[in-house]
Amino acid sequence: MAVSDVAGSQSRYDAVLVGAGIMSATLAALLHELDPELRLLMVERLQAPGLESSAAENNAGTGHAANCELNYTPLQPDGSVATAKALAINTAFERSLEFWASLTEKGKLLPQQFLHLVPHISVVFGDADLAFLHQRFQQLSALPAFASMQWSTDAAELAEWMPLVMEGRANAESVAATCIKRGTDVDFGLLTRAYVKSLQASGALELSCGCEVVHLHRLGKHRWNLDLKHSSGSRSVQTPFVFLGAGGGALPLLQRSGIPEAAAYAGFPVSGQWLVCSEPGLTARHHAKVYGKAKVGAPPMSVPHLDSRWIDGCRSLLFGPYAGFSSKFLKQGSRLDLLRSVRRSNFRSMLEVGFKNFDLVTYLLSELQQSEKDRFETLKQFLPNAQLNDWKLSVAGQRVQIIKGTAEGGRLQMGTEVVSAEDGSLAALLGASPGASTAVTVMLEVLQRCWSERMASESWQERLQKLLPSYGHDPNSDPLLLMQMRIRSNELLSFT
């Protein structure tokens, strides 16, 4: 993958994207499809794209479609479950599939390299959680987006869906599961690099790795200067648009930008670990993503799940994540990241969130104290016949949850949020899950905010309709449209 020589590169670009992860790569791909003449610069402090949060070993890779993640359908006081978030996430993932299908049709992506069809299963144990899962099944399966969802409490059928989970389990134990066969596993690191490779081949994108943004400031309306530091030297570049898509590193850069919209934000870093199995005899027998129910007080990223994964083309099983706390904002960051992010404008919000979420802090600290035996006992709740020597511990990526100052005080937010300058000259993506799976939808939001005139133009609207045939329509209110979207994606992405 070609990397530019900093000293010899040009200094003016139509857009500069900081961080070479799935978000920046998706935005670059969209911009190029909408206007092939745009000159784009992507800056990455590591030595290649997609090595931080987008790397397969650093995220769940589920292809989040809300098929199996129970935290997206919380139980309500009246006994029902909320479905709005699940529907929104499902729609966003269908849009990602739609975009990948279009680029595949153009010969720019090879889906078999990064995308695998894997059933998505939700499993619960015990009568109380069975009632919750059955309520979720009844409500979701009545919606077109989840109409293919299956329900079972039959031990023989469950053993077909997830043999390793059922083997060695007591017959008297209450177990229930739902299953959607059209689930996916996505290697977002490989997808990121595929985007970048295609963009470089077109001549539209300059990639600068091993390069950090040391300073950014406004030169005037719709004009930014970024000072870049590289092993081979330094330079300054100018652009009318900056996107900060650096994962946990986006918040410090947003703060350095000085835009008033950044003042209300802070970050709460959460770390994680996986147990990984590469034994062929086991990986060949588990073909599903099996999600359980999070412990009370646990953050969403700690929902236990056992996943079939393809990491750089090799099949493995991942179980976890085991949550923890680190003051780093990036896996390859500094332990001073959290301290350096404290500002007069966000200090009070950070304290308020700490007090309001003391149970969460306590939970994370308790997870840090877990021994190898403790982690293995958690695994055995999912896999009764698990053997310790088949599994090794691996560190997952860092997630920086959003702390936002509001009229009611500091609030801890799960999910992602786009923060942009009033004039649309700068945008940043903060937060975490569901993240990568919704990249196309989130980057369309960035374009609506920051490229609004171009987005409203006839030429861009025509290109958007070709790229995303469902653009401007809600498939949740049009079952025929949803069916057409899925038929097209299934065919072009070779879902069989």
From Swiss-Prot:
Reaction equation(s) it catalyzes: (S)-malate + a quinone = a quinol + oxaloacetate
Database matches in PANTHER family: L-2-HYDROXYGLUTARATE DEHYDROGENASE, MITOCHONDRIAL (PTHR43104:SF2)
Encoding gene, per UniProt annotation: mqo
HAMAP family xrefs: MQO (MF_00212)
One record GO biological process: tricarboxylic acid cycle
Pfam families in the cross-refs: Mqo (PF06039)
Keywords: FAD, Flavoprotein, Oxidoreductase, Tricarboxylic acid cycle
EC class (word): oxidoreductase
Listed EC numbers: 1.1.5.4
Single GO MF descriptor: 2-hydroxyglutarate dehydrogenase activity
Protein name, as recorded: Probable malate:quinone oxidoreductase
Keyword Transcription regulation: no
Source superkingdom: Bacteria
Record pathway: Carbohydrate metabolism; tricarboxylic acid cycle; oxaloacetate from (S)-malate (quinone route): step 1/1
Cofactor: FAD
Similarity section: Belongs to the MQO family.
SUPFAM superfamilies per record: FAD/NAD(P)-binding domain (SSF51905)
